[in-house]
Regions:
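Structured beta-strand-rich core segments of catalytic domains in phosphoester-bond hydrolases
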Residues: 12, 30, 34-120, 218, ...
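Short glycine-/acidic-enriched loop or helix-start segments at secondary-structure transitions
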Residues: 41-44, 48, 125, 163-166, ...
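A short secondary-structure junction signal
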Residues: 85, 114, 124-127, 165-167
């Protein structure tokens, strides 16, 4: 599962309850969250949501401004070992965007789960291309034997349409940055045939969105992989309905079932 939880925008306190309710209903084994808040004096949104689920959690390294940080998080039913990696700008210099590289001690073996949030600007495709290429390199360095092990999962808010260069280079629609590593996009494999918009004008939080009707959030499964491990069995959206009068986030979540044996 992946979900951009919209930091502390809008009615964030009411939304926190709605986020928890949606997560409880979906009961994901592993979820990547973006735009997670942490207070410098200790309160941590990821920790609170994980506690409600009974999950382990990890976040990217927080950088505080005015007492608050904006991070990516992974919540998991199983123990996590995680590190933070900085992602580049188009010119190769470090940006403020990060990836959380998590190794999860799952009952079916080690699961490499990478959660990220790429640059958002409409005209920043070149930056997102550099960031996607770096993600591929990081995953290639970290993955287990692709002929034997469960494949890596890449999740996040990519702020890009599926025909954009940054997505095409991950899915093998153009030359991949790391030969021998591409990713299956879970939605066209396991979705319901709809566009799968996660940035949808039906969401009341997007009443004034500049460019709605977009699928910005993705779950990717690494390839090559030993069939049938990692095969997408089903993919769906979550978080579309209001909980106690509030929709949980401005993005809808993407959830998938993967074959584990």
């Amino acid at each position: 599962m992946t979900w951009n939880v919209w930091w502390r925008f809008g009615p964030w306190q009411q939304r926190q309850q709605a986020l928890g309710a949606v997560l409880a209903a979906q009961a994901p084994d592993v979820v990547g969250l973006q735009e997670v808040w942490i207070e410098e004096d200790g309160r941590n949104q990821a920790a609170e949501l994980a506690a409600d689920l009974g999950h382990h959690w990890a976040t990217t390294t927080p950088r505080f401004r005015d007492g608050l940080a904006f991070v990516n998080a992974v919540l998991s039913r199983w123990p996590i070992e995680a590190t933070t990696a900085a992602l580049p700008r188009a010119d190769g210099t470090p940006s403020h965007r990060q990836a959380l590289l998590a190794d999860i001690d799952a009952p079916f073996g080690r699961l490499t789960f990478v959660n990220t949030h790429l640059d958002f600007a409409f005209d920043a495709s070149a930056t997102r291309v550099a960031q996607a290429a770096e993600l591929a390199r990081l995953i290639a360095d970290r993955r287990s034997d692709p002929q034997e092990a469960f494949p890596p999962v890449l999740a996040g808010d990519f702020n890009a349409l599926d025909h954009a260069d940054e997505i095409r280079l991950l899915t093998g629609a153009t030359a991949p940055p790391v030969p021998g590593l591409v990713f299956t996009d879970a939605w066209p494999v396991g979705g319901d045939g709809s566009p799968g918009y996660t940035w949808d004008p039906a969401n009341p939080h997007l009443a004034e969105a500049t460019w709605p009707n977009r699928r910005l959030d993705y779950l990717f499964v690494g390839w090559p992989r030993p069939k049938p491990l990692g095969t997408v069995q089903r993919c769906w959206l979550a978080g579309q309905s209001a909980v106690a009068g509030v929709v949980a986030s401005d993005h809808y979540a993407v959830v998938a079932d993967l074959r584990i044996g």
